[in-house]
């Protein structure tokens, strides 16, 4: 029986594509192992699944000064030796890395053990972890063709982003149950991602009295961010509902939405376009990120797929104005989204991984 070792973590975008691949390798009766951190979101998303989860020490690849930069190399080194032991014990036939700082020691350890490694980059520009991992990978799969110019040409394979069956086979009728049930109003889904939801939540909460005039609003605020007072004041009977997190049913919820406000992570954009959902993107600011979401948003705005509001310009007035403009041209936006080429991303990546197994 063949064995695959998956790794990725730090944000949901570095984990959910791995979940999509797990579904298919389970069907193929492969042994599946996962390497992540003990405290990252990957532990929450994968740790409770019926697969072996190996936690390793991790540092953080920062682009700014911090005293922790002096001790993190020690954690990364420890993570490398832990990964080396995992590779020797598990002996995977192939390793798939989705990115995030936890993956770097895993990729290098696999390379030392002569285990083939495939990496995947979701964003339009490669993250630091994937830049460091690329020399040790046989191939780097990319979601968007624009990413290829930043990587060695002989290693790039355009695959799209792996999307879970829960997204591609979603049921809008099931998802509708999550939304406030006021007939005649379109459903608005707002979610800020696993990180950086705060600024979006703040402005949306201020705008709620105006939003509920025109929408049934489902607001996914993130773990620990629930505003119980607001949730009670504007309950489902008044057109607004907050939830902290949606995992298994998220595909159904997304399918039921008429319009979406989202961060501009590559996986989120890919799912929105795949399901033909008119949307407004609010990219994370460069002050708290490497600017990848800003670049993602620029490209898809230029292509006509996405409407964008910069985080610095996000306020109730700009949000309401953006939604009014989007609803006024919603049919044209849907027609444009229908032009997007759907790739069998999971199939392409699975085939590439299988080719590496001798």
Regions of interest found by a model, annotated:
Residues 3-9, 26-75, 192, 312:
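Conserved nucleotide-sugar phosphate-binding/catalytic loop shared by glycosyltransferases and other
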Residues 40, 45-49, 168, 172-174, ...:
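Donor-nucleotide binding loops and adjacent catalytic segments primarily
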Residues 41, 52, 111-173:
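Active-site-proximal region of nucleotide-activated glycan assembly enzymes
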Residues 65-94, 112:
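An amphipathic, basic-hydrophobic alpha-helix
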Residues 93-94, 255-270, 277-278:
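Acidic donor-binding loop of glycosyltransferase active sites
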Residues 303-310, 314-331:
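C-terminal "capping" alpha-helix adjacent to the active site of nucleotide-linked donor transferases
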Residues 325-328, 342-358:
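C-terminal alpha-helical cap of glycosyltransferases
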Residues 331-343:
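A short, well-ordered alpha-helix in the C-terminal region of glycosyltransferases
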């Amino acid at each position: 029986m063949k064995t695959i070792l998956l790794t990725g973590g730090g944000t949901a975008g570095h984990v959910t594509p791995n979940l999509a691949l797990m579904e298919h390798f389970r069907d193929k009766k492969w042994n599946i192992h996962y390497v992540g951190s003990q405290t990252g979101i990957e532990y929450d998303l994968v740790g409770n699944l019926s697969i072996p989860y190996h936690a390793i020490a991790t540092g953080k690849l920062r682009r700014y000064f911090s005293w922790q930069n002096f001790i993190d190399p020690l954690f990364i080194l420890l993570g490398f030796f832990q990964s080396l032991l995992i590779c020797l014990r598990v002996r995977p036939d192939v390793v798939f890395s989705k990115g995030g700082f936890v993956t770097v020691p895993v990729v290098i350890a696999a390379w030392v053990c002569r285990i083939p490694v495939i990496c995947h980059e979701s964003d339009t520009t490669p993250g630091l972890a994937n830049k460091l991992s690329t020399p040790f990978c046989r191939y780097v799969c990319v979601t968007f063709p624009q990413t290829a110019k930043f990587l060695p040409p002989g290693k790039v394979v355009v695959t799209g982003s792996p999307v879970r069956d829960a997204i591609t086979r979603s049921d809008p009728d099931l998802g509708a149950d999550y939304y406030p049930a006021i007939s005649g109003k379109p459903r608005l889904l707002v979610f800020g991602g696993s990180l950086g939801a705060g600024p979006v939540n703040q402005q949306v909460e201020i705008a709620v009295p105006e939003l509920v005039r025109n929408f049934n609003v489902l607001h996914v605020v993130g773990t620990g961010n629930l505003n119980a007072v607001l949730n009670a004041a504007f309950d489902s009977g008044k057109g607004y509902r907050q939830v902290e997190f949606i995992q298994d049913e998220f595909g159904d919820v997304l399918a039921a939405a008429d319009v979406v406000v989202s961060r501009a992570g590559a996986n989120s954009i890919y799912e929105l376009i795949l399901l033909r959902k008119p949307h407004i993107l609010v990219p994370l600011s460069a002050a708290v990120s490497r600017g990848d979401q800003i670049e993602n948003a620029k490209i898809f705005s230029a292509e006509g797929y996405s409407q964008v509001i910069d985080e610095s310009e996000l306020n109730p007035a700009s949000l309401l104005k953006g939604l009014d403009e989007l609803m006024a041209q919603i049919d044209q936006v849907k027609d444009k989204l229908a032009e997007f080429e759907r790739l069998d991303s999971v199939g392409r990546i699975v085939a590439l991984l299988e080719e590496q197994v001798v």
